[in-house]
Curated annotation (Swiss-Prot):
Keywords: Ribonucleoprotein, Ribosomal protein, RNA-binding, rRNA-binding, tRNA-binding. The keyword RNA-binding applies. It comes from the Bacteria. Part of the 50S ribosomal subunit; part of the 5S rRNA/L5/L18/L25 subcomplex. Contacts the 5S rRNA and the P site tRNA. Forms a bridge to the 30S subunit in the 70S ribosome. Transmembrane segments: none annotated. It comes from Streptococcus thermophilus (strain ATCC BAA-491 / LMD-9). HAMAP family: Ribosomal_uL5_B. GO terms for cellular component: ribonucleoprotein complex; ribosome. This is Large ribosomal subunit protein uL5. The keyword Iron does not apply. InterPro entries: Ribosomal_uL5, Ribosomal_uL5_bac-type, Ribosomal_uL5_C, Ribosomal_uL5_CS, Ribosomal_uL5_dom_sf, Ribosomal_uL5_N. Belongs to the universal ribosomal protein uL5 family. This is one of the proteins that bind and probably mediate the attachment of the 5S RNA into the large ribosomal subunit, where it forms part of the central protuberance. In the 70S ribosome it contacts protein S13 of the 30S subunit (bridge B1b), connecting the 2 subunits; this bridge is implicated in subunit movement. Contacts the P site tRNA; the 5S rRNA and some of its associated proteins might help stabilize positioning of ribosome-bound tRNAs. SUPFAM superfamilies: RL5-like.
Amino acid sequence: MANRLKEKYTNEVIPALTEKFNYSSVMAVPKVDKIVINMGVGEAVNNAKTLEKAAAELALISGQKPLITKAKKSIAGFRLREGVAIGAKVTLRGERMYEFLDKLVSVSLPRVRDFHGVPTKSFDGRGNYTLGVKEQLIFPEINFDDVDKVRGMDIVIVTTANTDEEGRELLKGLGMPFAK
């Protein structure tokens, strides 16, 4: 069964973007390449259990096992040593990526308190979009009673778009609720 968002991309977004930006080929139309979800757990320096809990939550949210990230260099001010595990990340591609994006746009973002749309200024100049989420409770897989601490995460949506305008139109076509 094809994903709902992927079908929308094929049937609606590609023709709309081709018409707006006059692409010569269907292959020139921007698409979502991957989604990277990163959860930095600073308190993992003192307590390794918090990182395990965060990684388990990230696995529930994304549907795949996260990669544990380690500190690249020592920083005395943060009492951090090189090689210490301080976070977890997941890279989603293909079917899982579309499923996550669909869930993010239609279920999770509307559950954010006082939500007025995601900021339009979070593009990086190359059509990629970065979104910060303050709490993991917006995802339906997370059980409120099992949460020991509210943790945020960074969600980076990497597209093949060359400009921010193309990336914005692609994500808007896929249903991303940008602030007016």
